[in-house]
Amino acid sequence: MLVVISCKEENTECTVLRGFFSNSKDPSVVLYANDTPIDTVYLDKDKNFIFNLKIKESQLYNFETKGKFQYVFIEPNDSLVVYANAYNFDESISFSGRGAAINNFILVQANEARREADLFKKYQSLPPNLYKEKIDSLYQLKKNEYEAFVKVNPTLSEKAKDLALVSATFPLYKEMEIYPFVYQSEDNVPLNCVLPEDFYDYRKRINYNDTFLEYFRPYYRYMVMYINNLAFTKYTYNKHTLVDVSQELGFHLEKIKIIDSLFSKGSLRDNLYRNAAYAYIFNIHIQEHRAYKDYFNKFAKYNKDNEHKAELDKVFRNVIALQAGNQPPDFDLINTKGEPTKFSEIQNPKVTTIYYFWSVNQQELSNLIFNRISQLKRLFPNVKFVGIDIGQDKTQWKKQVQNTDWTDQYHSINFMDLSQKILINNINKSLIIDKDGRIISAFEDIFSPNLEKILLSKES
């Protein structure tokens, strides 16, 4: 439990988190306990801020500024200082003061995991025995790092040690759970037949119901992949051909049952179910899948008390609303003149139209999207293409559009509303509307070859 007070109000020693964010354009810093915001402070003219806290027990928090989130482990009477340059936040952030050691160790491990991502991808093509040798070697290095850290910091609390060990080793455990999904043997032998007997021995070292760690990203990401792998193994056990399980309803139904069998209650269970629901919605070709209502009904059976129930019920309703033949939902936009309009007002009922999305804040990917649109325009000259910017900088969007030959451009003024109604999880999404103003497809990736098949069938 955390109570935010002024330290001067009581004769007691305070816990302090202060910081300096050079070049920050965000006036505030928000402190979260788990997913709940508990306090907000404002940067002064010199870009300094301070949280004065009274806490009774150690807890993992995170703070947010300008869309950047960072974990911070705080113990009673800590006096932490965090530094970062807003221009390169992730690369420049560091801690000092009492309590800094564990927080800097977590930062180092997160940075190492990012750098090792390409290495893990190379390892995924190795046969199981060689793959395990590589991971075992990395595990020993990580364990040595952890033990050296504990040795030079003998006063670490048990919670701090747990965080250090998980931040160092769980990214490796997650990779072990991913491996069966991506490895393909030359003779297509099911992977569960050729894995070393001790391949999953690391699972014996894991506490699968650690409430202290349930919001810690390395721990949570491992749990997601653990559930995925259990479902993958069970679903493909008697199958002798490779299948893309992300497109299989049976795989997603297995996840529902597995989560229930392993986690009886709590936030971890609820969050894993939330992840499973979005994985189903965004990975399966749901508009072609007549069984989506079956999934929703089975999901609801296990999630009557889920803390995310209202959110997920709304998402499921939106999935149903986006089915082919329905009229698309309405949302607010502005045109290139800065005038407010609505999605319903810009539709042209006389022509098939693709609405594509891009972001002035994701320029590299947006350029690829515009190249794809140019290609589609050449292939389908009778189709209209309308771009909607979902970035956060209206001024930059307007400036960029005015300096290009892009036509039929609009800007979303409420991305949260738009993303919930259209179910946007990345900007590759497209929305295809027919000549009668009804949905043809609301779940097709703009780069998907299937999009061209859809247009060919409508234009033929």
Task: For every predicted segment, state its role.
Residues T341-I373, K384-I388:
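Short active-site neighborhood of thiol/selenol oxidoreductases, capturing the structured segment around
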Residues C7-L163, E175-M176:
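A non-transmembrane, solvent-exposed segment enriched in polar/low-complexity residues
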Residues Q400-K435:
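Short, internal strand/loop/helix patches
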Residues H308-S344, S412:
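N-terminal "domain-start" segment that seeds a small globular fold
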Residues N209-H285, D294, E311:
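Long, charge-rich alpha-helical interaction segments
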Residues V166-T236:
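Extended amphipathic alpha-helical segments with heptad-repeat/coiled-coil character used for oligomerization
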Residues M1-V16, A442, E459-S460:
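Bacterial Sec-dependent N-terminal signal peptides
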Residues I432-S460:
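Thiol-/selenol-based redox modules, centered on thioredoxin-like
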